[in-house]
Amino acid sequence: MSKCYITGKTTLFGNRRSHAMNATKRIWKANLQNVKIIDENGKIQKVKISARALKKLKLQRA
C-alpha cells in the first residue's frame, strides 16, 4: 500500500451512508505525489509525498 514518506498517511477505509443509512464500503486515498528529493547524505531519492506535506514543508527537491 502506498504511504507518504513524511507523514505516514495511507488509505482510509469506511462506509458510504445513504439517506436510509444503508452502508456500502468505500476508501479514501491520500493525494500522493511522486517527488525527487535530496536526502541528508546528498543523494537523490524518489519518494511519495502527500500534497499537504509538499505544501507545508520546504524540502530540497532535486
UniProtKB/Swiss-Prot annotation:
GO terms for cellular component: ribonucleoprotein complex; ribosome. This is Large ribosomal subunit protein bL28. NCBIfam families: L28. PANTHER family: 50S RIBOSOMAL PROTEIN L28, LARGE RIBOSOMAL SUBUNIT PROTEIN BL28A. Keywords: Ribonucleoprotein, Ribosomal protein. GO terms for molecular function: structural constituent of ribosome. Belongs to the bacterial ribosomal protein bL28 family. The keyword Ribosomal protein applies. The gene is rpmB. InterPro entries: Bacterial_rp_bL28, Ribosomal_bL28, Ribosomal_bL28/bL31-like_sf, Ribosomal_bL28_bact-type, Ribosomal_bL28_sf. The keyword Ribosomal protein applies. HAMAP family: Ribosomal_bL28. GO terms for biological process: translation. It holds the Pfam family Ribosomal_L28.
